[in-house]
């Protein structure tokens, strides 16, 4: 079997569909999505609230079941994997950034970024060294020992970015990553996020309703009513 690093396409999605039951009715959320994202590519998933962006990210992030179609990550067909194998894919190859930071409140900024590395099997020294590098790169060198409650919103989200990149994921999934920040702070966080993603050579899919933000990515696809309707 080829190494995951040998695959140029980080993710390939074919005919992805998702429907929910609402009483006697079936509500179609995703309607046959096809998408390929290549190694190192940063893709904007543009669409209004309710378009299906979060549902799509949950599907390709292996956070939900109940989808039909095919999801292939680094050459592995997800439908053929058991729960343990899917967890390993999430842990080793995917990173997540959300609108709200979801940091562990009883852990410092440094510890929040070390933790996913320790879970992956890194030594404490390795995890600490890489966490230092990421947080320093995000201009948080004076905040390493601070707890989330002691950080500003922008600082919290930068820690969340560092945590998402801690295991050098092949693919980062970000759902409105600056949606809870004011415009000026959001621009700073996004700039630093994109800089680090590119430096690590990760691919990324960033869901947003903001065209100005989307234009900063390598490619834009538009999701509307569960369908990809534009690409540019």
Curated annotation (Swiss-Prot):
Binding site for ATP: 47-54
Single GO cellular component term: plasma membrane
ABC transporter domain mapped to chain residues: 11-232
Organismal lineage: Bacteria, Pseudomonadati, Pseudomonadota, Alphaproteobacteria, Sphingomonadales
One family name in Pfam for this protein: ABC_tran
Main location as per UniProt: membrane
Protein name, per record: Lipoprotein-releasing system ATP-binding protein LolD
GO MF annotation terms: ATP binding; ATP hydrolysis activity; transmembrane transporter activity
Subunit description: The complex is composed of two ATP-binding proteins (LolD) and two transmembrane proteins (LolC and LolE).
Alphabetically ordered keywords of this record: ATP-binding, Cell inner membrane, Cell membrane, Membrane, Nucleotide-binding, Translocase, Transport
Stated family: Belongs to the ABC transporter superfamily. Lipoprotein translocase (TC 3.A.1.125) family.
EC number: 7.6.2.-
Subcellular compartments: Cell inner membrane
Stored PROSITE patterns: ABC_TRANSPORTER_1, ABC_TRANSPORTER_2, LOLD
Gene name of the record: lolD
Protein task: Part of the ABC transporter complex LolCDE involved in the translocation of mature outer membrane-directed lipoproteins, from the inner membrane to the periplasmic chaperone, LolA. Responsible for the formation of the LolA-lipoprotein complex in an ATP-dependent manner.
Lipid bilayer topology: Peripheral membrane protein
Protein species of origin: Zymomonas mobilis subsp. mobilis (strain ATCC 10988 / DSM 424 / LMG 404 / NCIMB 8938 / NRRL B-806 / ZM1)
BP terms from Gene Ontology: lipoprotein localization to outer membrane; protein localization to outer membrane
Recorded superkingdom: Bacteria
Family matches, as SUPFAM superfamilies: P-loop containing nucleoside triphosphate hydrolases
InterPro entries membership: AAA+_ATPase, ABC_transporter-like_ATP-bd, ABC_transporter-like_CS, ABC_transpr_LolD-like, MacB-like_ATP-bd, P-loop_NTPase
């Amino acid at each position: 079997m080829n190494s995951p690093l040998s695959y140029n396409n980080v993710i390939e999605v074919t005919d992805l569909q998702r429907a929910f039951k609402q009483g006697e009715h079936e509500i179609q959320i995703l309607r046959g999505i096809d998408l390929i994202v290549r190694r190192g590519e940063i893709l904007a998933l543009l669409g209004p609230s309710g378009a299906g962006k979060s549902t799509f990210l949950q599907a390709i992030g292996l956070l939900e079941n109940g989808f039909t179609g095919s999801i292939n990550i680094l050459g592995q067909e997800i439908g053929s994997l058991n729960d343990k194998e899917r967890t390993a894919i999430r842990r080793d190859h995917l990173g997540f950034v959300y609108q709200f930071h979801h940091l562990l409140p009883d852990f410092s900024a440094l510890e929040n970024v070390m933790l996913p590395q320790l879970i992956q099997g890194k030594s404490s020294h390795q995890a600490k060294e890489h966490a230092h590098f990421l947080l320093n790169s995000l201009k948080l060198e004076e905040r390493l020992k601070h707890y989330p409650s002691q950080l500003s919103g922008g600082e919290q989200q930068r820690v969340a970015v560092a945590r998402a990149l801690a295991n050098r994921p092949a693919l980062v999934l970000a759902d409105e990553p600056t949606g809870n920040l004011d415009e000026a702070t959001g621009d700073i966080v996004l700039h630093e996020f994109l800089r680090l993603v590119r430096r690590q050579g990760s691919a990324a899919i960033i869901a947003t309703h903001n065209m100005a933000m989307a234009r900063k990515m390598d490619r834009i696809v538009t999701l509307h009513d569960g369908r990809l309707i534009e690409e540019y």
